[in-house]
């Protein structure tokens, strides 16, 4: 239960946080209703298309890129952010942000002509919705624009091998 988790975190002097990917759908069901849209939009309506096909990140993670300019994506943002703020979350790690920068056939907003323009619009919307109610940390995000978050992860995941340790230390020192 989320609310019990949040309460317990705060009782221990910790700040509760949650993880999300606002511009990615991991399910791949293009006929599924988008959360927060009351059935008005399906994932097939809000997914970006490249050469007419739903856009996925190359390499096998299978996340489908969502159009940051689409009203359905923005309604989904409202649905989750409003719920999490009401619940008492204070930290939000948002990941796989590069999906929001994909170059696509087109975007919902016809004024948008590049992936970075779409990303800027979606991130401004998300940032404005959150306001100062949560600390936001970006992962797998473009270095610039950087104004939409309080922090960012500076390297990818590491594990227990010596090569991972070298990678983490190299990232920590910015390749010095």
Which residues fall in each region the model found?
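The substrate-binding groove and active-site-proximal loops of carbohydrate-active enzymes
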Residues: 1, 58-76, 98-118
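Glycan-recognition patch characteristic of GH18 chitinases/ENGases
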Residues: 1-3, 14-16, 21-24
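Surface-exposed amphipathic alpha-helices with a cationic face
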Residues: 3-14, 123-131
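Hydrophobic faces of well-ordered beta-strands that scaffold small-molecule active sites
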Residues: 16-19, 92-94, 136-138
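Short, solvent-exposed loop/turn and secondary-structure capping segments
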Residues: 21, 27-34, 104, 147-148
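Active-site beta-loop-alpha junctions enriched in small/polar residues
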Residues: 21-25, 97-99, 139-143
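Glycan-recognition surfaces
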Residues: 33-71, 75, 121-176
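An active-site-proximal structural segment forming one wall of the substrate-binding cleft
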Residues: 68-96
């Amino acid at each position: 239960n989320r609310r019990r988790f949040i309460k317990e975190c705060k009782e221990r002097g910790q700040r509760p946080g949650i993880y999300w990917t606002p511009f990615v759908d991991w399910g791949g069901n293009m006929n599924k209703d988008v959360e927060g849209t009351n059935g008005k939009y399906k994932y097939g309506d809000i997914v970006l298309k490249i050469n007419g096909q739903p856009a996925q990140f190359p390499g096998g993670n299978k996340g489908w890129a969502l159009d940051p300019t689409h009203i359905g994506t923005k309604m989904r943002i409202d649905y989750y952010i409003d719920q999490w703020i009401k619940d008492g979350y204070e930290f939000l790690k948002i990941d796989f942000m590069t999906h929001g920068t994909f170059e696509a056939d087109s975007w919902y907003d016809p004024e948008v002509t590049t992936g970075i323009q779409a990303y800027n619009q979606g991130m401004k919307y998300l940032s404005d919705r959150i306001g100062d109610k949560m600390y936001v940390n970006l992962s797998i995000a473009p270095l610039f624009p950087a104004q939409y978050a309080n922090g960012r992860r500076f390297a990818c995941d590491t594990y227990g091998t010596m090569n991972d340790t070298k990678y983490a230390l190299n990232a920590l020192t910015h390749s010095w």
